[in-house]
Structures are given as structure tokens and as C-alpha cells.
Curated annotation (Swiss-Prot):
Family, similarity comment: Belongs to the IF-3 family.
One GO term describing the cellular component: cytosol
UniProt name for this protein: Translation initiation factor IF-3
Organism lineage: Bacteria, Pseudomonadati, Pseudomonadota, Betaproteobacteria, Neisseriales
Function: IF-3 binds to the 30S ribosomal subunit and shifts the equilibrium between 70S ribosomes and their 50S and 30S subunits in favor of the free subunits, thus enhancing the availability of 30S subunits on which protein synthesis initiation begins.
GO function term, MF aspect, one: ribosome binding
Complex and partners: Monomer.
Record-level GO BP terms: ribosome disassembly
Keywords, ordered alphabetically: Cytoplasm, Initiation factor, Protein biosynthesis
Length: 175
């Protein structure tokens, strides 16, 4: 369902087709089951709209309210919910079987930063030429990365070979 169709989900005033409705007042108080004509008269008297809140109920539930204000509140709620969502990104760090300690520490520091920021990390180990014959060296390096990141992340996908590279996914630890 599109956002526009979802917004027009609630029928108002003349769009309501039921003969009898359960009416709720402006402050949320129950008025009771009344005819549609009575409810429309009450809405006009109070200078508000009659909005169908629950069309599937028997009888349908309608509320006296300012529809413009209602739409604004709904869009505000949607906007806040969207802001609270955090988009998890996957950051990638590439290693080689011959990565020295200095480079290893820099890459490890970046991995720790990614995981503490809440992002997932993809650790890629690239083999070139004859290095493919020594996959055990690469596996040992990935095991070392896993051990060094044990306190900030958990391995989501264990090392597996994809063509000429080994890939391992690490997710941040839940707080």
C-alpha cells in the first residue's frame, strides 16, 4: 500500500457509509452508539470532523476530531519512527596473508571503531598467485582477527572461500 493510500485510509464526514456508529468524543470519552446523522450534527455543532477510526468494528468506531491536526500528528509519528531507525552499514577491511603487525593493528583499530559505532564489518583476505596453496596462513590470520575482536563483536559468518579470497562477517555485540 502506498503512503498516499495509507494516509487516506480514514474516511471522514460524508465518506462514512455506516448507519450506526460507536462515537468517541474529542477528549476520548465514550459517547455511545448513535446514528450517523446524529454524529454528523454533533461534529458540525462542535466545529470538528467525524473521522472513522476503526471501519472493521461492529459498529464502526468514529471520533470527533480536527482531521488536519490528526493527519499532522500521524505524519509526525511516522517521521519520528523513521528517525529512530538506524541503518546498519557493512564496512569492509581487506587483509593479505602477509599483512605485517603495524598494518594489522591499524586495520584492527578501524574494525573496532566500525563495530563500536554499530556497523557490521566484512573482513576480506585476498590471495594472489601461489598464495592460494597456503590457505592455512590466511585462516590463521582470520582466527587471530576473530580472537582480537571477541570483546566488541561476534562472528556472524565464519571464514569461507569465495574465489581467490576468504570472507568473514562480524556483527557488533549486543549491549
Amino acid at each position: 500500500m502506498s503512503a498516499i493510500a495509507q494516509e487516506r485510509e480514514a474516511r471522514i464526514n460524508g465518506e462514512i457509509t455506516a448507519r450506526e456508529i460507536r462515537l468517541v468524543g474529542k477528549e476520548g470519552e465514550q459517547i455511545g452508539i448513535v446514528s450517523l446523522r446524529e454524529a454528523m450534527a454533533l461534529a458540525e455543532e462542535n466545529d470538528v470532523d467525524l473521522v472513522e477510526i476503526s471501519p472493521t468494528a461492529q459498529p464502526p468506531v468514529c471520533k470527533l476530531m480536527d482531521y488536519g491536526k490528526y493527519k499532522y500528528e500521524q505524519s509526525k509519528k511516522r517521521h519520528e519512527a523513521k528517525q529512530k531507525q538506524k541503518q546498519v552499514q557493512i564496512k569492509e577491511i581487506k587483509f593479505r596473508p602477509g599483512t605485517d603487525d603495524g598494518d594489522y593493528n591499524v586495520k584492527l583499530r578501524n574494525l573496532v571503531r566500525f563495530l563500536t559505532e554499530g556497523d557490521k564489518a566484512k573482513v576480506t583476505l585476498r590471495f594472489r598467485g601461489r598464495e592460494m596453496a597456503h590457505q592455512d596462513i590466511g585462516l590463521a590470520l582470520l582466527k587471530r582477527v576473530e580472537a582480537d575482536l571477541a570483546e566488541v563483536g561476534t562472528v556472524e559468518q565464519f571464514p569461507r572461500l569465495e574465489g581467490r579470497q576468504m570472507v568473514m562477517m562480524i556483527a557488533p555485540k549486543k549491549k
